[in-house]
């Protein structure tokens, strides 16, 4: 059985994952509107992935006799100046999620809740992969630039990335 402090933190993370899905879904819509179909597809997949992260946390709280509580989810930003801005914001958002996961891991360790600590290790590894992925996308912008050909190349490659 989880203590209430950990339940509250897990619920905060559930809601952050839900918000993350909405952020990527909205970014996908912006990309689609501006002709970046590869980026739109990529971000749509990531929106679905964030929902899976949320559901995994939701189920864990339920399975451990806690009560998952869905809070108010703010509307994400919906207008961007460029495709690069979309992915710069995405990288910063993933860094925020990483910091929140790390805080949660720290609380579970200090509380000697080793079961939840162990459960969260999947998220620790996942966040490492997410930051690496989005840093790599920014590296592509730096490498090929943002002219028409560069954007075409990046958009086409995004369609193939997981």
From Swiss-Prot:
This is Probable bacterial non-heme ferritin. Keywords: Cytoplasm, Iron, Iron storage, Metal-binding, Oxidoreductase. Pfam families: Ferritin (PF00210). One of its GO terms (cellular component) is cytoplasm. Gene3D superfamilies: 1.20.1260.10. It comes from the Bacteria. Homooligomer of 24 subunits that assemble into a spherical protein shell (12 +/- 1 nM diameter) that can sequester at least 2000 iron atoms. Belongs to the ferritin family. Prokaryotic subfamily. InterPro entries: Ferritin (IPR001519), Ferritin-like (IPR012347), Ferritin-like_diiron (IPR009040), Ferritin-like_SF (IPR009078), Ferritin_DPS_dom (IPR008331), Ferritin_prok (IPR041719). GO terms for molecular function: ferric iron binding; ferrous iron binding; ferroxidase activity. GO terms for biological process: intracellular iron ion homeostasis; iron ion transport. Residues 1-145 form the Ferritin-like diiron domain. It catalyses: 4 Fe(2+) + O2 + 6 H2O = 4 iron(III) oxide-hydroxide + 12 H(+). Iron-storage protein. It is found in: Cytoplasm. Fe cation 2 binds at residues 50, 94, 127. The gene is ftnA. Fe cation 1 binds at residues 17, 50, 53.
């Amino acid at each position: 059985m989880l203590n209430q402090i950990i339940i509250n933190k897990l619920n905060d993370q559930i809601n952050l994952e839900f918000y993350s899905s909405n952020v990527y879904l909205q970014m996908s819509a912006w990309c689609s509107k501006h002709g970046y179909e590869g980026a739109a597809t990529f971000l749509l997949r990531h929106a679905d992935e964030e929902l899976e992260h949320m559901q995994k946390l939701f189920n864990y709280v339920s399975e451990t006799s806690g009560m998952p509580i869905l809070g108010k989810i703010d509307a994400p930003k919906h207008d961007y100046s460029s495709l690069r801005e979309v992915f710069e914001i995405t990288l910063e958002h993933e860094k925020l999620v990483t910091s929140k996961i790390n805080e949660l891991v720290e609380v579970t360790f200090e509380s000697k809740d080793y079961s939840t600590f162990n459960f969260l290790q999947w998220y620790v590894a996942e966040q490492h992969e997410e930051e690496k992925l989005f840093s790599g996308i920014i590296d592509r912008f730096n490498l090929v630039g943002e002219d028409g050909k560069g954007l075409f190349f990046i958009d086409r490659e995004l369609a193939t990335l997981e």
